[in-house]
């Protein structure tokens, strides 16, 4: 049912779609003259989960307890697998948007107005433990796989479509849809003899790319046009993997090889998808594998002193146990690349990675940079 707020929101969206942040004095240096985006919608796993798993009663993949959130405003553990804000938050801040709230926090009659507002500026659908395949949530008890995250987006999409049609279309075409997923599917493959018997690494990673393609099409069909797709990082270099890999604490290159295979399949899939959709989709693929490799190879260049151990944990490389309330906490989180044994980045690392996304060259981004993407 239309409300009295509809005309205002229509004008507001049209305004956002045409506005550039460099129109505001003093914001130029902070944003690097970024073009504005009206909304940020986030899909993925624990790398960008803002607290959706807090609302899943039987999920064991949660971060709503200390030391998580030790550097978040008010030192609040929000459900982010991080000491502070994650990469999705950093992207929102770069574009001057509010932090996208977790989708599950917007349910219920008392949250109706908050839901309407979030539908305009962005929502976070990501879930710790989620994967591209629907089966990825079985190991951790409960998560929201990508297909269900897209279902949740479609319910938010209904709120957007209550606006005047041209404003809704403009909003969808100018917003940024960010996807960060795939690591848990690979972890499942490493740990499952059944999966390895059913398919070789090339077949499995190609199937991952094919299934992701199906979900990207669903989002595109709803009116989305701009996508930021983030590849899988070197999960063989997480503190947990290093701690198990001999006394030298080297990366697990076998695991890294599978990450490379998936990223190669992902890049080819995105190229094919653009052709199939006759150019109606515009995307930036960010090579997170390469960015993490460069940070680990030259940590001082990026401001880090420790790129092997976890900031929060216990034991060898602080990676024998998860980040629990009684875990050992590093004193300077700004110097650590990894927050915990699973390889979640610290807030400092997340911000560094987002800065690399926003560089003007294509060393990490293809076929265009993120700054070019939001200017199209």
UniProtKB/Swiss-Prot annotation:
Glycosylated residues, chain numbering: 134, 245
InterPro entries: GDSL, GDSL_Est/Lipase, Lipase_GDSL_AS, SGNH_hydro_sf, SGNH_plant_lipase-like
Principal location class: secreted
Single Gene Ontology BP annotation: lipid catabolic process
Signal peptide stretch: 1-29
UniProt GO molecular function: lipase activity
One GO location term (cellular component): extracellular region
Subcellular location: Secreted
Active site: residue positions: 46, 340, 344
Phosphoprotein keyword on record: no
EC number(s) reported in the record: 3.1.1.-
Protein origin, superkingdom: Eukaryota
UniProt keyword annotations, A-Z: Glycoprotein, Hydrolase, Lipid degradation, Lipid metabolism, Secreted, Signal
Family of the protein in this entry: Belongs to the 'GDSL' lipolytic enzyme family.
Name used for this protein in its record: GDSL esterase/lipase At5g55050
Organism: Arabidopsis thaliana (Mouse-ear cress)
